[in-house]
UniProtKB/Swiss-Prot annotation:
GO biological process terms on file: maturation of SSU-rRNA
Record Gene3D superfamilies: 3.30.300.20
Subunit architecture: Monomer. Binds 30S ribosomal subunits, but not 50S ribosomal subunits or 70S ribosomes.
Organism in which the protein naturally occurs: Helicobacter pylori (strain P12)
Protein name: Ribosome-binding factor A
GO cellular component term, pick one: cytoplasm
Cellular compartments annotated: Cytoplasm
Primary gene name: rbfA
Length: 111
């Protein structure tokens, strides 16, 4: 991955956190953005948020215009990527893997 893309994704992640924190919706302003993946040319960004509620995605879709407007004003960029929000389930996967490894470790201790 090139340095420019990494820097862009990092900046966008910070700006999105600030944008969400500034919204008047209690559910949205407490969300955590865990990861941002930008396409080439900064036309599209996949935004991973930490939540177990699928209803959050529709709220984020409705607030996308406000979020993009904040990003443009705060960054000074000429354009803001189209944002697609996705629930981040990597924490759940990690917890399941940890549980599996703990079971394996217990099995070895019993041998």
């Amino acid at each position: 991955m090139n340095a420019h893309k990494e820097r862009l994704e990092s900046n966008l992640l910070e700006l999105l956190q600030e944008a969400l924190a500034g919204l008047n919706d209690g559910e949205l302003n407490s969300l955590s953005v865990t990861k941002v993946e930008c396409s080439k040319g900064k036309h599209h960004a996949l935004v991973f948020v930490l939540s177990s509620d699928h209803k959050i995605l529709s709220k984020l879709k409705k607030a996308e215009g406000l979020i993009r407007q904040f990003v443009l004003q705060a960054s000074g960029w000429f354009k803001c990527p189209k944002l697609s929000f996705v629930l981040d389930n990597s924490l759940e996967k990690q917890l399941r893997l940890d549980a599996i490894f703990n079971e394996i470790a217990k099995g070895k201790d019993n041998d």
